[in-house]
């Protein structure tokens, strides 16, 4: 009888640990908190998830006033409709480099990407409104990240790529991120770039767009006319390289975490027709 009782106890313990494992996988909450939530709800996983969600929300409220000075920038391209760079912050560099934080950044990017595509780019016309909308849409993800990391996480800003008005047709957009860890588009420096195809019927290779964005990330601190700089890794100027690839530059945006954005916009041609006033 004693052996049977012990066997049942061991079986129950194994089953409980499996529930803890499942709950941790679904919520990413600490193991101890998962176990406590399951005990509180008498083994009801769904109710335990609600308990953890409420605790995470309460913890997030307490941590929102903490200063966030570390983090990552995220390149976000919404197809042909536009692009932006998002800055996501944490309290420590240790947290910013964690898989939890990096994956949260990726989910934030996905949320903005959907908004860009669904609105056909209209969401980016007002960066402050885009930021507010993104914060609202990702509130649950941010709260979950705060609960797991144990420190504050914020979406600091959304910087929009603005096209040159006179180079806004047949646009292709690319991105490049420097200092990435294991998650694409999340790193220390992010750049997005828009180019116009000289031949509208010709598709631009994704690798070509990446090359253009990488050049502007690499030369973001350089002074002078970007068109006369040597294109990254070549002997050609930027203007020559773009023309060689059937492209015309429209605009670029580069954000180095913690610094002011650097933008370039195609200058108006000197021989552009000026319409008389009145």
From Swiss-Prot:
A single BP term in Gene Ontology: mitochondrial translational elongation
MF annotations from Gene Ontology: translation elongation factor activity
Keyword Transmembrane helix among UniProt keywords: no
Pfam family membership, one: EF_TS
Signal peptide: none
Domain of life where this protein originates: Eukaryota
GO cellular component: mitochondrion
Compartments where located: Mitochondrion
Record has Protein biosynthesis as a keyword: yes
Record keywords, A-Z: Elongation factor, Mitochondrion, Protein biosynthesis
InterPro entries: EF-Ts_dimer_sf, Transl_elong_EFTs/EF1B, Transl_elong_EFTs/EF1B_dimer, UBA-like_sf
Miscellaneous field: This protein may be expected to contain an N-terminal transit peptide but none has been predicted.
Function statement: Associates with the EF-Tu.GDP complex and induces the exchange of GDP to GTP. It remains bound to the aminoacyl-tRNA.EF-Tu.GTP complex up to the GTP hydrolysis stage on the ribosome.
Similarity-based family: Belongs to the EF-Ts family.
The protein's name in its UniProt record: Elongation factor Ts 2, mitochondrial
Highest classification ranks of the organism: Eukaryota, Discoba, Euglenozoa, Kinetoplastea, Metakinetoplastina
